[in-house]
């Protein structure tokens, strides 16, 4: 459930929204820009093993290495880290260099199940206002379909 947008005073005024303290920057050398700080998906009630067993063919992504998001269109691409092929409900072989491609709003509409497992992590967000620390977390999420590109299955 989208609860609010990240807006600063200038863009909030343009959009008719109140500023919500979302502007961040690496240091005084950068102009502040409305950016994420802590982003997460709350845990659900689904069992991860049953979620995997329900997939005929897909991938299981355990980690994301890097990516980018167009803040205007919501289009994203993420390069996966540890990733495996799922065939007939079983995790089979590692997948090398997979790229997840889509639009945030579209993918959120395709979420079918949300696991009860949950992990928090940390990282960096790189943008025009510098590199800043971020917190993120989520459980295992099953998405009905997504564009996946890549080199090969190991």
Spans of model-derived segments:
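N-terminal small-residue-enriched
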Residues: 1-154
């Amino acid at each position: 459930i989208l609860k609010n947008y990240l807006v600063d005073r200038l863009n909030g005024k343009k959009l008719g929204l109140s500023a919500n303290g979302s502007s961040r920057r690496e240091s005084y050398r950068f102009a502040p820009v409305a950016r994420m700080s802590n982003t997460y998906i709350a845990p659900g009630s689904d069992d991860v093993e049953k979620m995997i067993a329900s997939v005929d063919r897909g991938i299981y992504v355990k980690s994301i290495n890097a990516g980018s998001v167009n803040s205007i269109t919501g289009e994203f691409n993420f390069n996966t880290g540890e990733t495996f092929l799922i065939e007939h409900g079983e995790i089979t072989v590692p997948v090398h260099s997979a790229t997840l491609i889509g639009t945030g709003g579209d993918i959120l509409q395709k979420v079918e199940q949300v696991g009860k497992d949950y992990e928090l992590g940390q990282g960096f967000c790189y943008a025009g206002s510098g590199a800043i620390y971020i917190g993120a977390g989520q459980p295992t999420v099953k998405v009905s379909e997504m564009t996946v590109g890549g080199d090969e299955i190991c």
